[in-house]
């Protein structure tokens, strides 16, 4: 089982993944991505889904038109782990392919 990050480890990790923040009242991290249109947003989600499935680590997310809101936590560990940080970094990289920083 993957270990939860300590508060300090989480803060250090968040500095390396632009746009991500802690979720108030929950051991999770979140970010919103805004794309040009729905097609880009859905394309982003499709690419992330392939990465998430390969890693067997799936986001909580929702899409409204051109915005994708994401929450990451590792349910088995009861909070944020390295798996969440790695998936967040992958999401940032994929979003960058669409010109979203």
Swiss-Prot record:
**Which Gene3D superfamilies did the record assign?**
Transcriptional coactivator/pterin dehydratase
Annotated GO biological processes are: tetrahydrobiopterin biosynthetic process
Q: What class of enzyme is it?
A: lyase
- What does the UniProt keyword field contain? Lyase
An example of a GO molecular function for this protein is: 4-alpha-hydroxytetrahydrobiopterin dehydratase activity
This protein's source sits in the domain of life called: Bacteria
**SUPFAM superfamilies registered for this protein in UniProt:** PCD-like
E.C. no: 4.2.1.96
Q: Does the keyword Transferase apply?
A: no
Reaction catalysed? (4aS,6R)-4a-hydroxy-L-erythro-5,6,7,8-tetrahydrobiopterin = (6R)-L-erythro-6,7-dihydrobiopterin + H2O
**CDD domains cross-referenced by the UniProt entry:** PCD_DCoH_subfamily_b
What is stated as this protein's family in its record?
Belongs to the pterin-4-alpha-carbinolamine dehydratase family.
HAMAP family, per the entry: Pterin_4_alpha
Provide the protein name.
Answer: Putative pterin-4-alpha-carbinolamine dehydratase
Organism of origin is Rhodopseudomonas palustris (strain HaA2)
Q: What is the lineage of its organism?
A: Bacteria, Pseudomonadati, Pseudomonadota, Alphaproteobacteria, Hyphomicrobiales
């Amino acid at each position: 089982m993957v270990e939860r990050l300590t508060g300090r480890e989480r803060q250090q990790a968040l500095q390396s993944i632009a746009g991500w923040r802690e979720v108030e009242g929950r051991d999770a991290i979140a970010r919103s991505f805004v794309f040009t249109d729905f097609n880009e947003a859905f394309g982003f989600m499709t690419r992330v889904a392939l990465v998430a499935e390969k890693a067997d680590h799936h986001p909580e997310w929702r899409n409204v038109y051109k915005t994708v809101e994401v929450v990451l936590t590792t349910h088995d560990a009861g909070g944020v782990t390295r798996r969440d940080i790695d998936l967040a970094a992958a999401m940032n990289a994929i979003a960058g392919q669409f010109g979203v920083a």
